[in-house]
Curated annotation (Swiss-Prot):
Name of the protein this chain belongs to: Aspartate 1-decarboxylase
Organism: Desulfitobacterium hafniense (strain Y51)
Protein function: Catalyzes the pyruvoyl-dependent decarboxylation of aspartate to produce beta-alanine.
EC number: 4.1.1.11
Catalytic activities: L-aspartate + H(+) = beta-alanine + CO2
Cofactor(s), names only, from the UniProt record: pyruvate
Binding-site positions, substrate: 57, 73-75
Length: 127
């Protein structure tokens, strides 16, 4: 049996751009991708905390250090600059691996700077 599990996420990132004219995807600062162990072209789910929208897309790396989080193409219709989003990457694990895998949860500040890395989520935890 295989299980689809949260592999990593960037928690409460701030949308810095929304580019309707781009062909698609989400652009994320290359450094944030490395910290979260998310690869270019990897499928992610984006959850908008401001309006509840959920979407799936793929990642393209943004310029290192600029802290860009930009929704491109049709996804740009689902966000506003300044919205708070959660970016989640999933992995497919064997049953055995799923029981021992520790995901990466990257907490960022309002400027999309990583401030904390956790390997679990606790109910009621705010950040």
């Amino acid at each position: 049996m295989f299980r689809t599990m949260m592999k990593s996420k960037i928690h409460r990132a701030t949308v810095t751009e929304a580019n309707l004219k781009y062909v698609g995807s989400i652009t994320i600062d290359e450094e944030l991708l490395e910290v979260a162990d998310i690869l270019p072209n990897e499928k992610v789910q984006v959850v908008n905390n401001n309006n509840g929208a959920r979407l799936e897309t793929y990642v393209i790396p943004g310029k290192r250090g600029e802290r860009t989080v930009c929704l491109n193409g049709a996804a740009a219709r689902l966000v506003q600059v300044g919205d708070e989003v959660i970016i989640i990457a999933y992995g497919i694990f064997t049953d055995e691996a799923a029981r021992t895998y520790e995901p990466k949860v990257i907490f960022v500040d309002e400027g999309n700077n990583p401030v904390k890395i956790a390997h679990e989520e606790i109910h009621g935890q705010q950040s």
